């Protein structure tokens, strides 16, 4: 790792339709191979689908609630102590929390069976707002691992 200077965080511009920075970050997570227009179409399609299903709810609010529900509070990191590897529970930093929740929602949506990615993403987001779905399962699994290894929490980093 270079020891020079800390690289400054790049400022991400808000998305054109809703003016939301988090949505713009999620667009970058969904994007593959630099195809931002495709990622944009998928996300806006998913949000439109959410709006059609629940006309009284704001789709951006549903997106925010889903992201916040999936955010992990703790995770485990491997730590080698005296020839043995321990899974040590550590608190997740806010930036990583957001990144993990977005990544997990994307992965859970990819594994779903619906036809289009927009539909998969919409259903995954709606399930995450209700506290269920693949991404929530992943978060609960990570929390369970941290809880199971709570005895090793004194091996701090």
Curated annotation (Swiss-Prot):
CDD domains documented for this protein: uS7_Bacteria (cd14869)
GO biological process: translation
GO molecular function, one term: tRNA binding
Matches recorded under PROSITE patterns: RIBOSOMAL_S7
Gene Ontology cellular-component annotations: small ribosomal subunit
Keyword match Cytoplasm: no
InterPro entries the UniProt entry points to: Ribosomal_uS7, Ribosomal_uS7_bac/org-type, Ribosomal_uS7_CS, Ribosomal_uS7_dom, Ribosomal_uS7_dom_sf
UniProt keyword annotations, A-Z: Ribonucleoprotein, Ribosomal protein, RNA-binding, rRNA-binding, tRNA-binding
General function of this protein: One of the primary rRNA binding proteins, it binds directly to 16S rRNA where it nucleates assembly of the head domain of the 30S subunit. Is located at the subunit interface close to the decoding center, probably blocks exit of the E-site tRNA.
HAMAP family assigned: Ribosomal_uS7_B (MF_00480_B)
Family, similarity comment: Belongs to the universal ribosomal protein uS7 family.
Subunit structure: Part of the 30S ribosomal subunit. Contacts proteins S9 and S11.
Protein name stated in the entry: Small ribosomal subunit protein uS7
Protein species of origin: Variovorax paradoxus (strain S110)
Source organism phylogeny: Bacteria, Pseudomonadati, Pseudomonadota, Betaproteobacteria, Burkholderiales
């Amino acid at each position: 790792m270079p020891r020079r200077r800390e690289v400054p965080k790049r400022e991400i511009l808000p998305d054109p339709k809703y003016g939301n920075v988090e949505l713009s970050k999620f667009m970058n997570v969904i994007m593959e191979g630099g195809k931002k227009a495709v990622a944009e179409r998928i996300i806006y399609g998913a949000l439109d689908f959410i709006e059609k299903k629940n006309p009284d709810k704001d789709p951006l609010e549903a997106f925010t609630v889903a992201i916040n529900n999936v955010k992990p509070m703790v995770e485990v990191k491997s730590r080698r102590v005296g020839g043995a590897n321990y899974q040590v529970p550590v608190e997740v930093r806010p930036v990583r929390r957001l990144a993990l929740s977005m990544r997990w929602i994307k992965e859970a949506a990819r594994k779903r069976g619906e036809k289009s990615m927009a539909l998969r993403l919409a259903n995954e987001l709606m399930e995450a707002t209700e506290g269920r779905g693949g991404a929530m399962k992943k978060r609960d699994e990570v929390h369970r691992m941290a809880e199971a290894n709570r005895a090793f929490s004194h091996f701090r980093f």
